[in-house]
Structures are given as C-alpha cells and as structure tokens.
C-alpha cells in the first residue's frame, strides 16, 4: 500500500456524528471483493438524488466544486460505526482520501482504515470544529497531516498533536499492510522453512 509520511491537501467537512459504514458505502454495492471501484459509490445516499447515482446532490459538500479533489475528510464523533465491512475504508481511499480527522472512531473501522493505508486522526472536538470553520471560511484551504511528527496543521497554521500506536505508525510510514509486513520477514521465513525436514513438509 502507499506509504504515508506527510500529506497536505484540500479538506472537506461532513459535519455529522455517527456516520456509519452503511452511509459510507451502502450494502447494495458490496458484491466486489477487490478494493477498487468503490469510490463512485461513497456516501451514495447523500451524494445522489436518485437510486441509480445519476443525479448529484448539489448541496452535499463532496459534490461542491470548491471541494473537488479533496483528500482529507473532517467529521464528528464515532465515525465508521455500524457493521465491520472493510469496504468502508476501501471506498474512502478509492475516492482519493488519505486521512480522516474526527474526535472518535468506531474501533473496527479504525483498525480497518490503518490496515488499508487510510490514516484515522483523533483530535479533540474543539480542534475538529476549528478545522471545519477554517476550511469553510477559506475556499481552497489546505490542511497538513504530519504522521512523522504526529501533528495536524490547520490552514491558519494552528497545530494539533495526535497519537497513534507506534506499530501502526511505522506500518503506515513504510506502506506495509499485513502482506507487506509478512514479506518483510521473507528471508527469515525461508530460512526457517529450509530447516524443516522433508518428511514434515
């Protein structure tokens, strides 16, 4: 997966709490088992006015021209609650998002996001509100997420620190998912396998 060190990008806010995985990617779009192709269905019931997804909702932030190309999502508490579907971080990443900033995340979503190279950043509610207000007030405003130094920088230059388990931080910095982490020990695995007697293989 793509490594995450420091990312600066356009931020977009969905000022709602308890955004669940069925809102992130509705169940009717879960038939695929590969990670690509889900971005078009992200927030389907909010982004579109029709079931077919042909009529964009002009009032939804992700459809507004000023937020086109946004790579950082701001949201309220308990983001990613609901079912454990891994398609939720797949859809967010396939849409082009690199980081989600919210006061709290559902535990399973939080882990799934990290495992798929999507950085979930927990900040105090007041910090998230300041970021939302600055982004709303300044078209084209960019936010920086610095994983190396564990800080977020607002459009005005305000800095907010966040925490992340060191193992997760290192995996994201190096772009290692579960498979990549295993392959990093390929030499040791091969050496161990070479010592297994033939009759036990």
UniProtKB/Swiss-Prot annotation:
Pathway the protein contributes to: Amino-acid biosynthesis; L-leucine biosynthesis; L-leucine from 3-methyl-2-oxobutanoate: step 2/4
Gene name for this UniProt entry: leuD
Protein name: 3-isopropylmalate dehydratase small subunit
Single Gene Ontology MF annotation: 3-isopropylmalate dehydratase activity
HAMAP family documented for this protein: LeuD_type1
Database matches in Pfam families: Aconitase_C
Family from the record: Belongs to the LeuD family. LeuD type 1 subfamily.
Gene Ontology, cellular component aspect: 3-isopropylmalate dehydratase complex
Function comment: Catalyzes the isomerization between 2-isopropylmalate and 3-isopropylmalate, via the formation of 2-isopropylmaleate.
UniProt-listed Enzyme Commission number(s): 4.2.1.33
PANTHER family membership: 3-ISOPROPYLMALATE DEHYDRATASE SMALL SUBUNIT, 3-ISOPROPYLMALATE DEHYDRATASE SMALL SUBUNIT 2-RELATED-RELATED
GO biological process, alphabetically ordered: L-leucine biosynthetic process
UniProt keywords, alphabetically: Amino-acid biosynthesis, Branched-chain amino acid biosynthesis, Leucine biosynthesis, Lyase
